[in-house]
Amino acid sequence: SSMLQKYGLYDLAVIENQYSALLALNLDMIPVNISVPDSARSQITGIMLRLTDTNVVSKELYPYVANTIEQINIVMKALIPEIQLEIYNDFDKLMENGKDGIQFEIITVRDDARIPLLYESAGIKKLISICSNLVACYNQESYCLVVDELDSGIYEYLLGECLEVMQEKAKGQLIFTSHNLRPLEVLENDFLLYTTVNPENRYIKSTYIKNTQNTRLSYLRSIKLGGQKEKLYNETNIYEMELAMRRAGKVGLHG
C-alpha cells in the first residue's frame, strides 16, 4: 500500500470539473504539479496554488514553484504566445507553523501589461492550471493525468493541437472526458471510449470504425442509424422541440 500511496502522491493527478467551475468563480485553489528532484520528494508531497489570490510557501519550496512557473511559460508560449505568467510582489513572510516563508501572487503579462489572473477567462485559467501536469505527463512514463471535461472553456482547435502532441510523443498517460467531438478527429479509434444510454454498460469501444475513417462522421452516423453494441444517444425530435419552444414563448402572454 505504501507504493500505491507514493504513486498517488507523486505520479497521479485528477482534475475534476468542479475545479474549473471554482476557477471561473475565482473561489478556490488548484493542484499544481511541482517538479522536484527525487531527493526532495519525501519532504514535498504536492502543493495547492491560488491562481487568483496570494500564496505563501516555505523558502525551501519556493525555488521549485518558480521553476514550475517557468515550465508553464514555455508551454504557454507555444499555446498562446501573447500570455506569460509572472511571480509578482514576492517577499518574506512568517508562516503559521513558525517557519520562514515567501508570499507571492501569480499574474499574467500581455504586451508588457500586467493583469491579475482574476480577470482572465475561465479557459485561460484552466489551461494554466493543468499545464504543469501536462508537462509531467508528457515527460514521465510513470505519470497519469486524469481530467474531467478537458474541453471545457478551451478553444476547439487548440484542444485538438494539444491532443495531437500528447498522442504522438507523451510518455505518460492522459485520460479525459469531453463533450466536444474534436478529439474524434485527432485521436486514433483504439484510444476512444463512447458513453451509452445503458447504465449497466455505460462505456463501450466502437465497432466497425477503422482509423482511416472519419471517426466524427461515423459517430454521428451511429447516433442516427445505430450499428453499435449499445445505443449512444436518446433520440430527440426536432419538431417536438420547435413546438415546445413556441408553447413556452406563449406562457404568461394571455394570463
Short names for language-model regions:
Residues 1-129, 225-231, 254-255:
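Phosphate-coordinating catalytic segments in nucleotide- and nucleic-acid-processing enzymes
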Residues 103, 125, 142, 171, ...:
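Active-site lining segments that contact anionic ligands and/or coordinate catalytic metals
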Residues 128-133, 164:
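Contiguous, well-ordered alpha-helical segments that form the cores/surfaces of helical PPI scaffolds
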Residues 133-143:
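Short basic/glycine-enriched coil/helix segment immediately N-terminal to the Walker B
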Residues 144-146, 175:
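Structural motif
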Residues 148-150:
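Walker B catalytic acidic pair
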Residues 152-156:
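Conserved D-loop-proximal element of ABC-family nucleotide-binding domains
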Residues 161-255:
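C-terminal lobe/lid and adjacent interdomain/linker elements of RecA-like ASCE P-loop ATPase modules
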